[in-house]
């Protein structure tokens, strides 16, 4: 028989840098999960990813206090900022442009995000990423 699910915990944790301090500790501690066990497993799974990149993770906590987790790809905004070489997006994206990004870079980001996005094809996913870039104040160049 399948285990009974007690809770789902959604967090964004820096790749390879999970530790028991907030936000990981309190979120998992409330559910009675072994925090160090999660941190070791998460860090092992994300050691191939660039350290410090925020990785969304969905942790399924079962009634017997065991857990499983699924990692997602980094948020599109983080990948766009990294590709454009900027610290943060524009506060006024329609007026102040903060950087430029090429269509090839957008397609590369869409390929990275393809596993988590529900778009029909890579072109649709690229357009979605392009919209995110524009809302951050990035200029898309052909």
Curated annotation (Swiss-Prot):
The modification N6-succinyllysine is found at residues 72, 81. The modification N6,N6,N6-trimethyllysine is found at residues 4, 40. It holds the Pfam family Ribosomal_L11_N. The keyword Magnesium does not apply. InterPro entries: Ribosomal_uL11, Ribosomal_uL11_bac-typ, Ribosomal_uL11_C, Ribosomal_uL11_C_sf, Ribosomal_uL11_CS, Ribosomal_uL11_N, Ribosomal_uL11_N_sf. PROSITE patterns: RIBOSOMAL_L11. GO terms for molecular function: large ribosomal subunit rRNA binding; rRNA binding; structural constituent of ribosome. GO terms for biological process: cytoplasmic translation; ribosomal large subunit assembly; stringent response; translation; translational termination. One of its GO terms (cellular component) is cytoplasm. Belongs to the universal ribosomal protein uL11 family. Forms part of the ribosomal stalk which helps the ribosome interact with GTP-bound translation factors. HAMAP family: Ribosomal_uL11. Part of the ribosomal stalk of the 50S ribosomal subunit. Interacts with L10 and the large rRNA to form the base of the stalk. L10 forms an elongated spine to which 2 L12 dimers bind in a sequential fashion forming a pentameric L10(L12)2(L12)2 complex. This is Large ribosomal subunit protein uL11. It comes from Escherichia coli (strain K12). The gene is rplK.
């Amino acid at each position: 028989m399948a285990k009974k699910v007690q809770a789902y915990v959604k967090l964004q944790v820096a790749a390879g840098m999970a530790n028991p301090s907030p936000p990981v500790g309190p979120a998992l501690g409330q559910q009675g999960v072994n925090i160090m066990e999660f941190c070791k497993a998460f860090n092992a799974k994300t050691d191939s990813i660039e350290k410090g990149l925020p990785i969304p993770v969905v942790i399924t906590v079962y009634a017997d206090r065991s857990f499983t987790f699924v990692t997602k790809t980094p948020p599109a905004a983080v990948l766009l900022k990294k590709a454009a070489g900027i610290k943060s997006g524009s506060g006024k994206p329609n007026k102040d442009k903060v950087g430029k990004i090429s269509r090839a870079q957008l397609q590369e980001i869409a390929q990275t995000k393809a596993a988590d996005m529900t778009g029909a094809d890579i072109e649709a996913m690229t357009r979605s990423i392009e919209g995110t870039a524009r809302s951050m104040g990035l200029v898309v160049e052909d």
